[in-house]
Amino acid sequence: MPSKNSINRPKLTSNLHHKVHSLNKKRAQRERAGLLKPARSSVNSKSGEIKSVALDLYFQNKKNESQNSTAVTLQNASSSPASITTRTLSKKRAKKIERNLKYATQRKLLVDASAKLEDEMDIDLDGGKKVKENEKKSSLTLVKEALWSVIDDTASQGLIIENGQGTTLGGPFFP
C-alpha cells in the first residue's frame, strides 16, 4: 500500500477508518483497566466541581494520621498504601492550608457571635422599653399624656372647608 504522501495515495475515508479503529482499541483497553474517566455529561462526572489537589492531599494525610494514631492492633506489612502517587504536599503549603482553615473557623465564630449579639440586642431593647414605661406611670405622667392626647386630637382636625361649586363667591363660573 502506498504511503500517505504518495501520488496515488488511498482515499481519506480509509485513513480515517484506520485512525478511528486504533483510537477505539486504545479507549476500550483503558476502559477495561479502569483508567477512563466518565463523560462530562455523565452523572458520575466531577467536571463541574471545584477541586483543589492540595486540600485533597491535606485532608487525606490528616485522615491517615488519625487512623494510625487510634489503631490498637499491630501493623502488618500489607498495610502499605494501595497506589503510589507522585503528588506530595510541601510543609509550607500544609501550614498555609492550616492557617486558612483556622481563619475560616474564626470568621464563622465571629459571624455567629455577632448574629447572636444582634438578636439579644433586639430582644433587650423591646423588653426594656416596656418595663421602663410600666414603672414610670405615675399620676403626673398620666395627666400629661391625657392633656397631650386632647391637644393632638383638636390639632389633627384642623380647618374643614366644604367643597362647593363655582367660585369663592358661591356662584357657578363659565369662562
UniProtKB/Swiss-Prot annotation:
Biased composition (Polar residues): 1-15, 72-88
GO cellular component, one term: nucleus
GO biological process entries: ribosomal large subunit biogenesis
Keyword Chaperone among UniProt keywords: no
Region (Disordered), start-end ranges: 1-43, 72-91
Major subcellular site: cytoplasm
Compartments where found: Cytoplasm; Nucleus
Keywords: Cytoplasm, Nucleus, Ribosome biogenesis, Transport
Domain of life: Eukaryota
Record's keyword annotation contains Nucleus: yes
Extent of Basic residues compositional bias: 16-29
Family: Belongs to the ALB1 family.
Other facts: Present with 4780 molecules/cell in log phase SD medium.
Assembly and interaction partners: Component of the nucleoplasmic and cytoplasmic pre-60S ribosomal particles. Interacts directly with ARX1.
Function: With ARX1, involved in proper assembly of pre-ribosomal particles during the biogenesis of the 60S ribosomal subunit. Accompanies the pre-60S particles to the cytoplasm.
Name the UniProt record assigns to this protein: Ribosome biogenesis protein ALB1
